[in-house]
Swiss-Prot record:
It is an enzyme of class 7 (translocase). This is NAD(P)H-quinone oxidoreductase subunit O. It comes from Synechococcus sp. (strain CC9311). NDH-1 shuttles electrons from an unknown electron donor, via FMN and iron-sulfur (Fe-S) centers, to quinones in the respiratory and/or the photosynthetic chain. The immediate electron acceptor for the enzyme in this species is believed to be plastoquinone. Couples the redox reaction to proton translocation, and thus conserves the redox energy in a proton gradient. Cyanobacterial NDH-1 also plays a role in inorganic carbon-concentration. NDH-1 can be composed of about 15 different subunits; different subcomplexes with different compositions have been identified which probably have different functions.
């Protein structure tokens, strides 16, 4: 029988754990140049970087964000979001 590795590879975790209901904004440097940015308008709206948006749902490495504007909810990688302060 093979023994489990004594030194498991650590998994990458975001610096701040984002949970449902958190107020967030998009980190500009993480977002620009990403796949999500290239699939969207070339000039993203400023309100996503200013915040706050509410994190409605978390699935895997993505979160659904609702902005306090009459716009559709969006799915973004959690690594592109930061806590609004």
């Amino acid at each position: 029988m093979a023994e489990p590795s004594a030194d498991p590879t650590p998994t990458a975790k975001p610096a701040a754990t984002l949970k449902k209901g958190a107020l967030v904004r998009v980190n500009r440097t993480s977002y620009l140049g990403s796949v999500e940015a290239s699939a969207s308008d070339p000039r993203p709206p400023e309100y996503i970087f200013e915040g706050p948006g509410e994190l409605l749902l978390v699935k895997g490495e993505y979160g659904q964000v609702r902005w306090r504007r009459p716009v559709p909810d969006v799915w973004l990688k959690l690594s592109q979001l930061e806590v609004f302060s």
